[in-house]
């Protein structure tokens, strides 16, 4: 099932009925400079979304999140930082602004995400380093600087959070293999 974030935020789509939720943020972020109304329509995790994801995780849900601005967009208030650190289990490290390499390693693979404009995919000009918190661990690293590109957490619920858009992985074979690893992590019952 696919739906808009607004459908989740207003309660039309209850997350608790799904074993796994994939929240794809792409390049979404709050943009107060080009938005004269100064609203938070494009905020990565609005207050209603934070409530929905908190409820979902507290019910034992499994969450995959990916996006270029999931750290920096949530680093401006203590409440936003507490949400990402305490529930999603990551903290913002920094944005990578060089364009030298889009190579990422982990889960038995090295793959790439475009950093410069091209005719095949949108560029991820500033992927984010996200740091594990509260029992989470790094699972993917950016090859330039060996910094954390994705974290995973396993407790009463599970999270797999990527500091770049999943859909930006260039090769289909890499996307398929990475998704298979993510789904295995999110669905494996550790109590067996």
Regions found by a protein language model. Give the residues of each.
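Alpha-helical scaffolding within the catalytic cores
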Residues: 5-12, 47-52, 144-149
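Active-site beta-strand/loop signature of hydrolases that rely on acidic residues for catalysis
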Residues: 25, 60, 162
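Extracellular ligand-binding/catalytic regions of CAZymes and related secreted enzymes
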Residues: 75, 79-97, 132-137, 145-192
């Amino acid at each position: 099932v696919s739906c808009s974030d607004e459908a989740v935020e207003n309660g039309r789509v209850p997350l608790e009925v799904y074993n796994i939720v994939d929240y794809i943020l792409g390049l979404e972020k709050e943009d107060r400079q080009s938005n004269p109304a100064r609203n938070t329509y494009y905020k990565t995790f609005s207050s209603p979304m934070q409530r929905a994801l908190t409820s979902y995780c507290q019910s034992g849900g499994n969450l995959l999140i990916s996006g270029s601005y999931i750290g920096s967009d949530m680093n401006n208030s203590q409440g936003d930082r507490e949400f990402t650190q305490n529930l999603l289990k990551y903290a913002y490290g920094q944005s990578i602004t060089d364009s030298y390499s889009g190579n990422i390693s982990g889960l038995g693979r090295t793959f790439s995400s475009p950093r410069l404009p091209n005719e095949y995919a949108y560029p991820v000009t500033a992927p984010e380093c996200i740091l594990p918190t509260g029992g989470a661990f790094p699972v993917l690293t950016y090859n330039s600087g060996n910094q954390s590109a994705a974290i995973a957490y396993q407790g009463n619920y599970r999270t797999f959070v990527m500091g770049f858009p999943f859909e930006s992985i260039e090769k289909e074979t890499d996307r398929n293999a990475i998704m298979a690893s993510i789904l295995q992590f999110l669905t494996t019952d550790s109590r067996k």
